[in-house]
Design a protein with these regions (language model features):
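A generic alpha-to-beta junction signature in SAM-dependent methyltransferases
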Residues: 43-45, 68-69, 142
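A short acidic, Gly/Pro-enriched loop at the edge of an enzyme's catalytic core
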Residues: 107-118
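A short SAM/SAH-binding and catalytic strip from SAM-dependent methyltransferases
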Residues: 117-131, 154
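Class I SAM-dependent methyltransferase SAM/SAH-binding core
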Residues: 50-109, 133
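Conserved catalytic/acceptor-binding region of the Class I
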Residues: 132, 139, 143, 147-219, ...
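Conserved hydrophobic residues forming the short capping helix/wall of the S-adenosyl-L-methionine
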Residues: 69, 91, 169, 198, ...
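Conserved class I S-adenosyl-L-methionine
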Residues: 1-47, 60-64, 83-86, 93
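Conserved Class I S-adenosyl-L-methionine
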Residues: 2, 12, 20, 24, ...
């Protein structure tokens, strides 16, 4: 793998988090898949396009891009070796010869200049250590007139999964809700911030549109609670908790999720931004 600057993210995604996402890739696609349609509509991938998928994870979006670019190609890049192993296996199983994957840090990866017509990303760009440098590096990989389209987390207050997690505060040290622009998952949640970052990175025709979609977390409240507690912020909150506290936290979260359960399982509103830009 080429040099990495986002070392904290690399450690996380090559440890427990990466293994969890690789092992549960279908479930994470059920959580995030409601945003695929607005993302790929914005990307407008053509049949001969060469597509770069940033932070591709287990490769769902890379495979979607490869199908749309049937006479082109799609390259997924990610820090996580466990997720890339899953991505390669899934693409091979689907017979997608035009999908490939590379382990690397998109912020500094030595992409071939002007090699791609489109760059896409689903919920990965929020974690860049230096977003201006990262997006500038991606711009260099796009041909003149090439398109950037990504979805990132939107207004924290409109993400119901985050609100539900506050129920854990009865038992665990839940931090205050994040504000748009805070480092991490919501670092690009403010449209003006996104426009500023992309303008500084050299892009033109920048757009940011708020979208919402249901996120499917589990077949019932108990299943969804176990899944939410198995990864991400909730998993870290449980670190160090004794068994009794962890059990009470799970029971409380299950109760908070019951109002969101229906015949199709537990669905919570997710809010994101669909961002588009052009490389001059």
């Amino acid at each position: 793998m080429h040099p990495v600057v986002n070392t904290e993210q690399a450690q996380a995604w090559n440890g427990y988090e990466g293994d969890h996402w690789a092992d549960h890739h279908d479930r994470w696609n059920a959580v995030n898949g409601g945003f695929d349609e607005p993302l790929f509509t914005a990307a407008a991938i053509g049949p001969r396009d060469h597509v770069l998928d940033i932070g591709c994870g287990a490769g769902r979006t890379t495979r979607l891009a490869a199908r749309q670019a049937a006479d082109g190609r799609a390259l997924g890049i990610d820090l996580s070796a466990p997720m890339l192993a899953r991505a390669r296996a899934e693409a091979a199983g689907e017979g997608l010869a035009n999908a490939a994957f590379v382990q690397g840090d998109a912020q500094v990866h030595p992409f071939a200049p002007a090699a791609f017509d489109v760059a896409v990303s689903r919920f990965a760009t929020m974690f860049f250590g230096d977003p201006v440098a990262a997006f500038a590096n991606i711009r260099g990989a796009l041909r003149p007139g090439g398109r950037l389209a990504f979805v990132c987390m939107g207004d924290p207050g409109r993400n119901d999964w985050l609100r539900v997690l506050t129920a854990l505060g009865e038992h665990l040290p839940v931090p205050p809700p994040p504000s748009p622009g805070d480092p991490g998952m919501f670092s690009l949640a403010e449209p003006d911030r996104v426009r500023e970052v992309l303008a500084d990175a050299g892009y033109a025709d920048i757009g940011a549109t708020a979208v919402e979609a249901p996120m499917h977390w589990g077949r019932d409240a108990a299943d969804a609670a176990r899944f939410l507690l198995g990864s991400g912020p909730a998993h870290h909150l449980l670190a160090g908790a004794d068994r009794a506290t962890a059990r009470r936290a799970e029971d409380t979260l299950t109760a908070a999720l019951r109002p969101h359960a229906g015949p199709a399982g537990v669905r919570l509103r997710g809010a994101a931004l669909v961002v588009t830009a052009v490389a001059p």
